[in-house]
Regions:
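Start-transfer (signal-anchor) and selected internal transmembrane alpha helices
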Residues: 1-45
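Extracytoplasmic loop-helix module adjacent to an early transmembrane segment
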Residues: 36, 49-72
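Aromatic-anchored segments of alpha-helical transmembrane domains
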Residues: 45-48, 133-141
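Short hydrophobic/aromatic helix or loop-helix immediately within or flanking a transmembrane segment
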Residues: 59-67, 76-98
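Loop-to-helix entry region of an early transmembrane alpha helix in multi-pass inner-membrane enzymes
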Residues: 84, 96-113
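Transmembrane-helix signature of polytopic, membrane-embedded enzymes
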Residues: 116-136
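Specific aromatic-rich, kink-prone transmembrane helix
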Residues: 132, 150-155
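Short acidic/glycine- and proline-prone juxtamembrane loop motifs at membrane-interface regions
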Residues: 143-149
C-alpha cells in the first residue's frame, strides 16, 4: 500500500507540474510540458500496473494466457459476449512470443494510457483529477478486471 501512496503523490506532483511549472524558457504554449508530464505519468502508472505479479484476478488472467496455443483461436467462442477481440489480441500476443508479464504490461499501457488521455482532455484541474483517479479506485480497478478496464478505457 505504501508503494501505491508514493506513486499517487509522484503522479499528482507531475500533474501539478504539467499545469504550473515551465521547463526551459517561459513559453505561453505550455503544450510541451503537458505532453512530457502526461507521458511520464502514463509510464509510471502503466509500469506499476504492468509489473504486478498478483492482484485480484491477475492469476486467472496469467493462467488463461499461458494456456493459449496455436490451435486455441480455432476453438474459441467468437460470440460478442465471449469478448472475441480481447481473445484475438491475446492470441496474437502469444503467437508473437510475448511473455506473460509483457501481456500484463501491454494491457496496462493500453488501459492507463486511455484513462489518462481521457481525464486530461476533460479535466479543469489535472492534479485533482489524478488524485481522484486513485482515491475512487479507478486506477486499481484496471488491476482487477483487465477486459472490463480496457473496454472502459477504449470506449
Amino acid at each position: 500500500m505504501r508503494e501505491l501512496v508514493i506513486l499517487m503523490l509522484i503522479t499528482v506532483a507531475l500533474a501539478w507540474c504539467a499545469d504550473h511549472v515551465a521547463f526551459g524558457p517561459v513559453n505561453p504554449n505550455r503544450r510541451h510540458r503537458l505532453i512530457f508530464c502526461t507521458l511520464l505519468i502514463i509510464i509510471l502508472l502503466a509500469g506499476f500496473a504492468g509489473l504486478r505479479t498478483h492482484c485480484n484476478d491477475t492469476g486467472a488472467y496469467r493462467h488463461s494466457y499461458e494456456l493459449i496455443t496455436e490451435s486455441s483461436w480455432d476453438t474459441t467462442d467468437k460470440s460478442v459476449g465471449a469478448n472475441p477481440l480481447f481473445n484475438w489480441i491475446n492470441y496474437q500476443l502469444k503467437m508473437h512470443g510475448v511473455s506473460t508479464q509483457n501481456f500484463l504490461m501491454f494491457w496496462a499501457f493500453l488501459t492507463v494510457g486511455c484513462y489518462i488521455i481521457f481525464v486530461r482532455g476533460y479535466s479543469a484541474n489535472y492534479p485533482l483529477t489524478i488524485f481522484l483517479l486513485f482515491t475512487t479506485g479507478c486506477y486499481t480497478f484496471a488491476f482487477a478486471g483487465i477486459k472490463q478496464a480496457a473496454a472502459i478505457g477504449i470506449a
